[in-house]
């Protein structure tokens, strides 16, 4: 068993969180990650409703035995924080408040009996979330799928580990037992894993996304803002999103087109023109596999590798 701060604090057996991927990580995915020994986080995106959260929470709770976690986009709560209320009503164990200053919301998370964690992309982010009183941080590197920063996982992880007394998890490019073993050996308390789970049948979202990920290599991603602009998603400019390349990115990435032009060309139902957010570990996803099987394999292989040196 891989014992860390994360496993001891949550009472889980695998030091792994399933990433709260908006539009992809619902109750089935989260529940299966939890049932396999980690903790799956439901992605509470700004377009989700309290009714959707309640329904997905019930699924995750039944599959995972009651343990729940969620991830929210902190910047979106400034205009409307009712989604946080809906999350806390589900009595989660962990709430991830990322991409912005969580200070206004951490006390509410703690009052609800949950741990507050934050993904960070720079040391400046670290100082902000430390001041906010979070319980742990996730050093998320540029390799990660979806929205992320611009520093690679290993450089960022090392700097964060040397700069804080908070428990630190790692995210970005971790899609196998080798990846988990590497960050644990570096001093992380666990990993946040997303891309490795994206081809699992438990994900929500378009069917073509799983097929495209399995067919992709690790060179088939691009860090871009065109999909946010095409869908009128008001993400702060400092966070682009890593997605699989397709005809749409070939035509529009880096072109400087206006939102109306980008929106007119976008079609989320067409794999050539829709978005599939995924990280540089895409080349490690070679088939569609159940999420629980993936989590168990990652844990087993990481333990085998670490035992060689322990």
For the regions a protein language model found, what residue spans apply to each?
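Conserved active-site-proximal phosphate/metal-binding subdomains
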Residues: 153-165, 169, 175-310
